[in-house]
Design a protein with these regions (language model features):
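N-terminal leader/targeting and accessory segments in enzymes
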Residues: 1-115
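Phosphate-binding loop of NTP-binding sites
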Residues: 85-90, 97, 101-227
Length: 227
């Protein structure tokens, strides 16, 4: 199991300005796109890299290109391949949770590795409700989020439920609860950082899952227990 060093490369949001960031995994589901938007907004130079081609990623690329609020002069792409020099030269690599760090030559070359979840947890002051498990995560976080908003709170919902918490980081305060659905992979990417300190932790039913990745229940359960 990989353990990350504690803390975050960025002490403040202003530290992001003019840093060179590699977003590994632009994708089509919004997570990589949210990372690109966040780091461009804070003045970083961003290289988005993905094994998918520009044609395959056209919807995401078009959304970024057509947003007048983004300074896309600081955005470059490397698509259809990864280049190890990009990872060596970056100040920080933003890792997709679906990429294994063990045995990955690109991530091994990186000076610093973060995720959207690790960045969010480092900077938010919001109380966090963290939910993991094999079955029932999404319905559980959705119910909690609905209940909090119905009770008069301004609550946010993100994580594995396909909403990156970076999209609402700067709207959070000590009074805005955040409900995070966290997969085993997202939890593994937090090991050693010391940033996950939820007010409430919930683990739903655990059953064999993702065994093509873990090859045994013990490491899978160990990642879930981290939550």
């Amino acid at each position: 199991m990989h353990t990350y060093k504690s803390g975050c490369i960025f002490n403040t949001l202003s530290d992001i300005k003019d840093r060179h960031i590699v977003v590994m995994g632009l994708g089509l589901n919004g997570g990589g796109e949210a990372c690109v938007r966040f780091f461009l907004k804070h003045g970083a130079y961003v290289l988005a890299t993905d094994m998918k081609t520009a044609e395959q990623l056209k919807p995401t690329i078009d959304r970024l290109a057509s947003d007048p609020e983004l300074n896309t002069s600081k955005l470059t792409y490397r698509l259809g391949e990864h280049c190890i020099e990009d990872f060596k030269n970056a100040d920080c690599v933003i890792k997709n949770p679906g990429v294994k760090i063990e045995g990955n030559k690109y991530l091994s070359a990186a000076k610093n590795i973060e995720t959207d979840i690790s960045i969010f947890l480092h900077f938010t002051k919001a109380p966090v409700i963290a939910v993991t498990g094999s079955k029932g995560k999404s319905s559980t976080v959705s119910a909690i989020h609905y209940g909090l908003n119905s009770a008069g709170y301004t609550a946010f919902l993100g994580g594995n439920i396909t909403v990156s918490p970076l999209t609402f980081l700067e709207k959070t305060t000590e009074k805005t609860p955040v409900v995070l659905e966290l997969s085993s992979w997202q939890l593994a990417d937090l090991r050693g950082r010391g940033s996950l300190k939820p007010k409430i932790s919930i683990i739903t039913k655990i059953v064999p899952d993702h065994q093509n990745w873990y090859h045994a229940m013990e490491p899978y359960v160990a990642d879930k227990q981290y939550g």
